[in-house]
Amino acid sequence: MSSVFTRGSVDSMPETHINLKSTIPSIKIKTEGVEKLLRNINPYKASGPDNIPNRILKQCAKQLAPSLAIIFQSSIDTGVLPKYISSIYKKGDKHSAEYYRPISLTSVPCKLLEYIICRNMMNHLEKHNILTSLNHGFRSGYSCETQLAVTIHDMLQSFDRKKQLDIAILDFSKAFDTVPHDRLLHKLNNYGIRGPLHAWLTTFLT
């Protein structure tokens, strides 16, 4: 699985103009917030590796929320995250590990925890204007449509000014699989993602 667990030395990291002194605030899990997320679960979606039906999680939200809140908080504070990993064949030689992708099967409660962490991280990044306005992926209020609107605007502007316009469309092979985790974690540290949350993300990526 070398294509997935790419290693890269942080010694050769390019200089970055972003090195926040401000650290992301500690995430405090609230029972009410967990209960709300449980109530919003789609009961018709498949359950996770724990085989707990979504309908049970949704209908028992009030009873489950206090315990899950404690587990979520403990996971963040200790950096411990249980995993169940399965290899999924994509294409090519079935006898070569290169053509299999390891998938971490996540339980529904764990997905809720991931959502909470992601929301806190995005709030931190948005607050400090770390994300460029040109990044339209995986952001609230941004989408393929907003990216297309910007592209069309730039095209029409170039046409009006009678300037040359070149468009390069790139598709990186296994882009997500080959991100060096050491470099990613180093970058997150520069962005103020430190302490227990950084340790949790390290476990998540391992």
Feature-to-residue mapping (PLM):
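Amphipathic alpha-helical interaction/coupling elements
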Residues: 55, 67, 116, 150, ...
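Conserved short loop/turn motifs at secondary-structure junctions
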Residues: 52-60, 135-140, 169-175
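Surface-exposed loop/turn segments and immediately adjacent short secondary-structure elements
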Residues: 1-99, 104, 112, 192
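Residues that mediate protein self-association or partner binding, especially
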Residues: 5, 38, 89, 109, ...
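A short alpha-helix capping/helix-loop junction motif
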Residues: 127-134
